[in-house]
Swiss-Prot record:
This is B-cell CLL/lymphoma 7 protein family member B-A. The gene is bcl7ba. Pfam families: BCL_N (PF04714). Residues 109-129 have a biased composition (Low complexity). Residues 55-80, 94-148 are annotated as: Disordered. It comes from the Eukaryota. Belongs to the BCL7 family.
Amino acid sequence: MSGRSVRAETRSRAKDDIKKVMAAIERVRRWEKKWVTVGDTSLRIFKWVPVVDTKEKEKSKVSVGGEMQRKNFPSEESSDNACSVLLDFQDENSNQSSLSDSYQHKAAADSSNNSSPPASEPVSPAPQSLDYRTDDPQPPTLGQEIMEEPLLQSSEIADEPPTLIKEDLLPLTAQEDEDSCGAPPLKRICTEQVSVIQMVPLS
């Protein structure tokens, strides 16, 4: 008896989970990305907004549009605000709405904080750091010179590909011949072919 009841519980739980997943899928199908005005500001962000059916859209325009016209707001902002209100009410537990709302608040905070400083301060972090190193009045200590030289050498090596010189090839092939004496014949053939291929373009 207890086994049957446990199975029935898991079946009913699975059915509930399936219903939740299907509802979430249906909700996701009705979403689209739109430019939305943030609150009363002129800031517009590109975020996920639920796609409203034409019947629901007309109802929301009539109800929200009347309230917005009383407050002397344009109708475009009213439809965007209606979509954002629907976003909050339709999907309170979804990650999409919480992320978009947090992004909306962050964008609004950034716009209010960053509206005046960029006009007064030029932003150029990279040249300032380079100028600081070149104009450094103190000479570097012995330890600093040693640390800087390997960095320069490694960057020079990374920029230039290694080049093979005929003198470098000859000792390598001699070593390969010595090493390949005990190797199987296939390996000997391959190494000989590689050395021939490398020598041909140089000569």
